[in-house]
């Protein structure tokens, strides 16, 4: 279990040594996922014996409280598949009770969306990202290991019906699998308020061969968009890592997440807490800094905030993916991608 000494960090608790400010917390609430995506957990979720349990509702309240006290305004709930937790709605409601948190986003595989999305909205979810890696049901099944394409698409329709104005759809484009779907996705969003986000396949410890076989450069997609008349938009304070493109003839937008791009880390504004209570300064890199011993009481808030602030001073300027170094991350499910 890694801890760090607490040191004085000045008056800006969520500013790192490179003057990047962190307004955005990605909070994983479970490692469990019921899909078996070939780029993430191809063998499905494998529970580990004798490992710590996932954060409790009260621990989640306390960690969000500390981050909010330090300036965080957006929380994204991730997993695994976060909606598999039986207390998912109470978790959302608890986060929503914090007046500093302006946005509560959810990343989901969409498995429960058709049935539950109205309840998610009522509980406080302000925006949804749903993973749809292909618009072809057979390819969707091949990539995810689950024959639920129609259910997910019904869930997407239902999300619009209950009042979400725009949905973000995530797709990991992979050579010789779904890269040919790129143009089909663009046609699909022409008259739909969807931000179609293409995520560049990332190398992890367990997936080196898969990466070498299927990686598609995000820059190739960016060049295609620009040549077709799409224009790059400026980023907002609470936006994620995607480069967003718009076209005058399209209702939808395109987002590109390109971690191998030069200066990808320059605008980083997010920190991660794993489902077992570790602070991760980067998706790729360190093993995490334990917070859980300071998530037992409201009386520990100042200690917790000091630990987070001090840890942030050790955040690196950038990852080393471009050098083939994916850090210690075996897969992306454990800290929510």
Swiss-Prot record:
Annotated positions binding [4Fe-4S] cluster 2: 265, 268, 282
Chain positions recorded as GTP binding sites: 26, 76, 107, 168, 270-272
Record EC number: 4.1.99.22
InterPro entries named among the record's database cross-references: Aldolase_TIM (IPR013785), Elp3/MiaA/NifB-like_rSAM (IPR006638), MoaA (IPR013483), MoaA_NifB_PqqE_Fe-S-bd_CS (IPR000385), MoaA_twitch (IPR010505), MoCo_biosynth_MoaA/MoaC (IPR050105), rSAM (IPR007197)
Needed co-factor(s): [4Fe-4S] cluster
Reactions the enzyme catalyzes: GTP + AH2 + S-adenosyl-L-methionine = (8S)-3',8-cyclo-7,8-dihydroguanosine 5'-triphosphate + 5'-deoxyadenosine + L-methionine + A + H(+)
Pathway: Cofactor biosynthesis; molybdopterin biosynthesis
Segments forming domain Radical SAM core: 17-242
Co-factor binding details: Binds 2 [4Fe-4S] clusters. Binds 1 [4Fe-4S] cluster coordinated with 3 cysteines and an exchangeable S-adenosyl-L-methionine and 1 [4Fe-4S] cluster coordinated with 3 cysteines and the GTP-derived substrate.
Pfam families from the UniProt entry: Fer4_12, Mob_synth_C, Radical_SAM
SUPFAM superfamilies (alphabetical): Radical SAM enzymes
Top-rank taxon: Bacteria
Class of the enzyme per the UniProt entry, highest EC level: lyase
UniProt: [4Fe-4S] cluster 1 binding residues: 33, 37, 40
GO MF term set: 4 iron, 4 sulfur cluster binding; cyclic pyranopterin monophosphate synthase activity; GTP 3',8'-cyclase activity; GTP binding; metal ion binding; S-adenosyl-L-methionine binding
GO biological process: Mo-molybdopterin cofactor biosynthetic process
Binding site for S-adenosyl-L-methionine: 39, 80, 131, 202
CDD domains for the chain: Radical_SAM, Twitch_MoaA
Keywords annotated in UniProt: 4Fe-4S, GTP-binding, Iron, Iron-sulfur, Lyase, Metal-binding, Molybdenum cofactor biosynthesis, Nucleotide-binding, S-adenosyl-L-methionine
HAMAP family to which the protein is assigned, alphabetical: MoaA_B
Family: Belongs to the radical SAM superfamily. MoaA family.
Described function: Catalyzes the cyclization of GTP to (8S)-3',8-cyclo-7,8-dihydroguanosine 5'-triphosphate.
Complexes and interactors: Monomer and homodimer.
Protein known as: GTP 3',8-cyclase
Source species: Pasteurella multocida (strain Pm70)
Lineage, uppermost ranks: Bacteria, Pseudomonadati, Pseudomonadota, Gammaproteobacteria, Pasteurellales
């Amino acid at each position: 279990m890694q801890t760090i000494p607490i040191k004085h960090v000045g008056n800006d608790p969520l500013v790192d040594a490179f003057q990047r400010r962190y307004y955005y917390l990605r909070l994983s609430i479970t490692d469990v996922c019921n899909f078996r995506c070939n780029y993430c957990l191809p063998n499905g979720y494998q529970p580990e014996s004798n490992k710590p349990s996932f954060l409790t509702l009260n621990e989640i309240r306390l960690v969000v409280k500390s981050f909010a006290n330090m300036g965080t305004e957006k929380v994204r709930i991730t997993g695994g598949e976060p909606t598999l937790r039986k207390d998912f709605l109470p978790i959302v409601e608890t986060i929503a009770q914090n007046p500093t948190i302006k946005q509560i986003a959810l990343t989901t595989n969409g498995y429960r969306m058709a049935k539950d999305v109205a309840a998610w909205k009522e509980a406080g979810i302000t925006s949804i990202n749903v993973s749809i890696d292909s618009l072809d049901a057979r390819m969707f099944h091949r990539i995810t290991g689950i024959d639920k394409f129609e259910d997910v698409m019904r869930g997407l329709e239902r999300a619009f019906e209950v009042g979400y104005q725009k949905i973000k759809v995530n797709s990991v484009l992979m050579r010789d699998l779904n890269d040919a779907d790129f143009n089909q996705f663009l046609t699909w969003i022409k008259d739909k308020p969807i931000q179609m986000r293409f995520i560049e396949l990332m190398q992890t410890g367990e997936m080196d061969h898969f990466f070498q076989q299927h990686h598609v450069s995000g820059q190739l997609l960016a060049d295609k968009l620009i040549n077709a008349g799409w224009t790059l938009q400026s980023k907002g304070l609470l936006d994620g890592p995607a480069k967003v493109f718009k076209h005058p003839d399209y209702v939808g937008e395109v987002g590109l997440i390109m971690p191998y791009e030069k200066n990808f880390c320059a605008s980083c504004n997010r920190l991660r807490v794993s489902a077992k209570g570790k602070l991760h300064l980067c998706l790729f890199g360190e093993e995490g800094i334990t917070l859980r011993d300071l998530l037992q009481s409201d009386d520990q808030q100042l200690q917790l905030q000091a630990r987070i602030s001090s840890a942030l001073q050790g955040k690196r300027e950038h990852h080393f993916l471009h050098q083939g170094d994916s850090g210690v991350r075996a897969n992306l499910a454990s800290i929510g991608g």
